[in-house]
Amino acid sequence: WSGSMANVMEDTIKQLYNLLWFCKKVQIPFEVYAFTSNFPRSFSPEGHVNPKPLYEPKDELVSIDKYFSLMNLFTSKVRGRELEDQMFNIYRIVKSFRNYHANRVIPMGMGLSGTPLNETIVALHSILPRFQKQHKLEKVNCVILTDGEGSPLTYHKTVQRDWEDEPYMGNQYINEGCFLRNRKTGKTYQMTDNWYQFTPILLKDISDTLPNVNFIGIRVMDTRDVGRFLRMNDLDCNTEEYKEKMRYYKRTKSVAIEN
């Protein structure tokens, strides 16, 4: 639900609706979430946005934006007519994103925001096992539709500032000298200075943690971004594999990368 997706959000929603109709037809349970940093979870007595803490900050713990939320847009738990009404309502909102004069129809908190993709992957560690348990599933498919990478996360770090008497807990950037450790699995992953490699590391971690979940990413992009996307995923532009994928994209307007 990021601002950069305004021009492609309608196509993204159409792709999502195709998935929903298929799941509904063959009776596959589903939940649909939209990531956002714009949804007000709570307000102060004066009416200002007052986000509640998502967790207790601790030194060396990955930091999650306090404004991060997941909006549960759709669920298979509702009846068919109710789901259709919800889909119509969301589609009306999406249509207004490209029309400046229609922005008044957007409900509070439903406007486009940043791209908290990495925060979402962290949250999936809780969402997916709960979903799998509720529906008694052996296998789960998790489909993520986005138009780009999220910003790298930081971690909490307590420092003593010269002008203050008490220690201050701030945030430190994660670089190649850092290791991500999953306290449940005990596995560690070396980080990198390349901001676009942060998401693949988080995906590797959650794939190791949840082996019965199949992760599928659907990336919506302009034609001019395809080559850059392939290179960002470690495909050398001088290799035959890269050239073949570019030829395939020109024919079909789509390309697949297997991890």
Regions found by a protein language model. Name each.
Residues W1-N259:
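Acidic, glycine-rich A-domain
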